[in-house]
Amino acid sequence: MNAGRQLFVRSIRDFSTFVHTPDAERIKLVESGLMLDDQLREAYRIRGSFTDSRYHTWVCFEFIDKTGVSRYVRFRLINADRGPDRGLPRPEFKANGHPSMDAEADDDRAPDFLRKDFIHRVRHSDVRYILQAQLRDTPPPPVGNHELFDPSQPWNEYWFPWVDMFEIRLNEVIDDQAAVSRLEMNPNRSPECIRIPLATSPDDYASLGHARAIVYPGARAARAAVPPPQNN
């Protein structure tokens, strides 16, 4: 899951173009409409804590209920107090194609202050989230590149309201970095009732989720095959 309700590109081809474009030249992608600066801006956070943000899947998944009815689902994680998304930049802020920026000159916080703050909160406070889902019917007839797959656009919350799934309470931090490094995020490991919509083109809206399912396991295996650095 990621901060911001939506991604700043529409397809895996657009994302690949973004990745392979030097940072100084990405403003041209914004000007051409390939990168969406309003969506990118929404992923920025200025102050606060990891616990202040809402986290979204961006892509949707196919969900088949116990009666065999197929729908589509998106997920998000919100703070248990159900407060708004906090720490957003001022309305006049522009990302200009930059997915991240250096700290401001007057920001004297440590580079890892968010991580340390989160660890402290988990150990000494009450850190709770609520997992929510949006459900959307399959369009009749099914359309291969339907706008519901577009990762750059949120679903209308009036027509597709968020529904509580369960509460998550965090009470322990894993300090074993070796154990953490062995963890893997594999989109293919999901219940049988949740599936990844497939794309037929790198320009399809569903291509981002499809590509993740292919790339992530291979990237994880490649990282695992590299010897860990030695401390002198």
Swiss-Prot record:
Residues 86-107 are annotated as: Disordered. InterPro entries: Catalase_sf (IPR020835). Residues 86-95 have a biased composition (Basic and acidic residues). GO terms for molecular function: heme binding. Gene3D superfamilies: Catalase core domain. Keywords: Plasmid. It comes from the Bacteria. This is Uncharacterized protein y4iK. It comes from Sinorhizobium fredii (strain NBRC 101917 / NGR234).
